[in-house]
Amino acid sequence: MLTLCGVAWTGDAFGPALGVLRWPLLALFVAMLAGLALHAVPPLLGLGLGAMRRLGLARRAGTGGRAVGAAQAGAPQAGAAQAGAWLDMVPSPGRSGVSDGAAARFGSDGRLAAAGPRTAVLLPVCNEDPARVFSAVRAMRASLGDAGLDDVDLHVLSDTSQAGAAHEEEALFRALGDPGVFYRRRTSNTGRKTGNIAEFCARCGGDYAFMVVLDADSLISGATVGRLMARMAAEPRVGMIQTIPYAVNRETLFARMTQFAMRLYTPLWAEGAVLWQGPGANYWGHNAIIRIAPFLEHCALPVLPGRAPLGGEILCHDVVEAALMQAAGWEVHLDPTLGDTFEEVPPNLIDHTARERRWCQGNLQHMRVMLWPRLRLMGRMHLGAGISYYAAGPVWVLFAMLLGFAPAAAARHLAAEAWPPLLALVVLPRLASLLVVLASRRQSAAFGGRLAALAGVMLDQALTVLLMPLNLLVSAQFVAATLGGRSVGWSTQPRCDRGVGWGEALRLLWPFLAAGSAWVGGLALLLPGHAAVLLPALAALLASPALAVWSSRVSLGRLARRGGLFCTVDEVAPSRELRQFRRAMAAEREPDAPGPARRGGVGPAFPGAMTAGEAGLAGGVVPVRQRADSVAG
């Protein structure tokens, strides 16, 4: 519907004046609108659902009426309704939202009232900072004890290949002395994270009913684990429940802006996503609980025919596992009401782009997976959404290139008509989230106040616009490289506040600067009438190395924090688990602390390791030396 409205808005802009480019431009424009609409619908649905609830048009589950779209009290739509008033979507410090069915299993102190099936928390790691890993283990074990879940075991599943890191992992495990923590290291990380989890299931799966799967940078509270267990026990047809992990702990300007954006924009998106996905939600690979028996029976992943990058092992396994779980008749739910579930994000633009390169290859593999028989509609939609996200870059670039060769008057008319619907689909979801926050004093306080939240959104939007030319070119190049047969390694992601130097930024970004400058310069020479439109895009592209360097600075991140910018509730009022984890990490980083943690996050975790930016971009951009090791996940 949004796509059709956008096409109708343009009127006669796609008229005969465009000549032979008329229909190709229209097809690309429809694809651009559809891609933006796909991501704009959930937050707008969330806003509408919240407004209806506030006006009394949609009742909460358990109040004598049905939530809008809920088929039963336990459906995920009802779970969204139980989250509270529509302006109360950010969890209060130390509190996690919980559905009525799960709450019945807890006492007034938050402890589990009755013993349920056994659960294991899995922490897969590969060549990570051991101090960071076991600081998280200590924090989560303490939190599980506080929730009365001492019988929940925590398994550190190591694929670490570097001898120094492996030795330190084993030493920290022995020093922990906790009978509820188990450590296992594989000598060969066959299958990466998928193989790591599969080995655990084959070895220990019969001992547990559920597993809470984390990433190496994840953190989750005991209370949230208990609520996940309770809901799984109460709803026997649910195979997976995905929580929403929020980004924490990084201090660079780039990472703090990312953490701010995730905290501000995600709740409204999640409200709408629960409404339209129902029991056909997605799995993101971590911070989720899984019923082990059907996972073992139905979610084993085959090796795709052919060679990498489109063949071989499935890299982005999570969405495929969710699709297989649904195909077998099991439900997959997204539960945005659960708080105290966290992850970390890349500290800078270079590392973020390297991760996108890996994810691009993994999602393009799903073009083959979508053809598998027996997959359900929602499973195929999630696979298609990932593909369309990365296909958007080439579509936008091709549209701009073709528009440059259209007659000048017709091109200017089309640009003027096409820009408003595209801009609306980008801005409206963010504006809706901002309005929700500004309307609530409590929520705006979690972002440093109304003025700080407004300023943060404006600066975040400005950086998004400045980086758009680079991001589109990068995405287009990644897709072209993958389809052209260039595979990428899966290297360990930095878990520290790594800064980017001028040399690294220029070395890794110069192909995009050269390609963009040549294209814009050539069009300006061939079509002087388009120069005024092209120059702003060229200026933003040329500024991208400086943006990559400056946004990676911890000093600027801390300066923004002192000024009240890009604050989140996890800084203003952090949970007990975050405080425990940060204290443990601070102790490990004291000058007399042993091991790689002493370096305070200024480079790769161990000597000889490449940065993630170099390793990830090498797969499709700059030929630099490769690593033999790979990360679990």
Model-predicted regions and their roles:
Residues 1, 122-126, 132, 373-395, ...:
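Loop-to-transmembrane boundary segments
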Residues 48, 356, 367, 371, ...:
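A transmembrane-helix-recognition feature enriched in membrane-embedded lipid enzymes
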